């Protein structure tokens, strides 16, 4: 059996990374052992509340259901047991909420995308909210290391009567370690389909050539922490005005609009701390006025 390097091999020293993670003679991520993990979660409802109808998991992804309110299922937590994502890895997550299910899906910790040789890491997330289900996709941040390569896609399917809140956020470089991106590739796609019709498509891309120009105001204006949040439900106007009212008080740039029957908000901050603080503030206020549901700060964010 081929031995898998532990996460401790991914140190701050790039030369150490190459020595430990790359076998002699390999010049591509294809020559290395890579992860192909996936999970599927299907949720419905019963007299007791949300029920788990089906769960599938393939290493290195694990799915946990911490019980925080007696026997009720309110939160699903995804764990990447490999400790991070490397070039050539492929990870897929599928979540479907049906009937009157109410669930928040988050991650145990921030996801780390390590430096790659040539191949991109591929991360695909598919979210489906049907009937009168309420689904919140609230993972913790994704930290993109210097010279990492990431292709990520978020596909969402919603139907009239359902309610959904989805968030994805990126940290470009390990700013807490003083690291800044000098090169790297990030491709981030969103596709949202409502009642079988595409209502919103968005693509964000960073290449090696773009990284040196982050300081430009037309690009990121030196912001290294960015996020996109999307809401669909019956309280569109109220949620839109709430975020607009909060925006001036946040420790980051924030813009929000109503498009395609969705509330779409963008956030950009100079530090991960500022962005996390802003998102916590928005989520704490966002659920106010809505029926009891998953649209709050996940408990795992405080662990």
Which sequence ranges carry the predicted segments?
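N-terminal, charged/glycine-rich beta-strand/loop interface patches
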Residues: 2-141, 146, 153
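N-terminal intrinsically disordered, cationic/polar leader segments
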Residues: 2-6, 28-38, 42-58, 130-137, ...
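A structural signal for small-residue-enriched, beta-sheet-centric alpha/beta enzyme cores
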Residues: 7, 170-303
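Preference for bulky hydrophobic residues occupying beta-strand positions
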Residues: 41, 93-95, 127, 156, ...
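A short, polar/proline- and glycine-enriched secondary-structure boundary/capping micro-motif
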Residues: 62-65, 114-120, 147-149, 175-179, ...
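Short, structured patches in soluble enzyme cores that scaffold and shape functional sites
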Residues: 97-99, 107-109, 129-131, 139-141, ...
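Structural motif
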Residues: 102-104, 134-136, 163-165, 227-228, ...
């Amino acid at each position: 059996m081929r031995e898998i390097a532990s996460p401790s091999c991914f140190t701050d020293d790039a030369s150490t990374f190459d020595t430990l993670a790359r076998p002699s003679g390999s010049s591509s991520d294809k020559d290395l052992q890579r992860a192909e993990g996936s999970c599927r979660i299907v949720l419905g409802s019963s007299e007791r509340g949300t029920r788990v109808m089906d769960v599938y998991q393939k290493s290195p992804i694990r799915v946990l259901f911490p019980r925080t309110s007696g026997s009720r299922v309110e939160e699903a937590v995804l764990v990447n047991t490999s400790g991070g994502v490397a070039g050539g890895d492929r990870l897929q997550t599928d979540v479907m909420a049906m009937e009157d299910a109410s669930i928040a899906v988050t991650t145990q910790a921030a996801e780390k995308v390590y430096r790659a040789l040539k191949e991109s890491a591929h991360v695909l997330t598919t979210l489906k909210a049907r009937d009168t289900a309420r689904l919140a996709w609230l993972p913790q941040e994704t930290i993109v290391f210097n010279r990492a390569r990431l292709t990520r896609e978020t596909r969402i399917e919603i139907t009239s009567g359902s309610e959904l809140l989805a968030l994805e956020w990126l940290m470009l470089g390990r700013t807490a370690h003083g690291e800044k991106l000098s090169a790297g590739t990030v491709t981030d796609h969103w596709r949202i389909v409502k009642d079988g019709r595409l209502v919103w498509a968005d693509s964000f891309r960073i290449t090696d050539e773009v990284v040196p120009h982050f300081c430009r105001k037309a690009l990121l204006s030196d912001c290294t922490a960015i996020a996109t949040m999307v809401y669909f439900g019956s309280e569109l106007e109220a949620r839109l005005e709430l975020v607009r009212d909060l925006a001036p008080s946040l420790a980051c740039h924030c813009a929000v609009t109503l498009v395609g029957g969705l509330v779409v908000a963008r956030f950009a901050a100079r530090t991960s701390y500022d962005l996390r603080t802003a998102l916590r503030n928005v989520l704490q206020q966002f659920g106010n006025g809505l029926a009891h549901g998953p649209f709050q700060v996940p408990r795992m964010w405080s662990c």
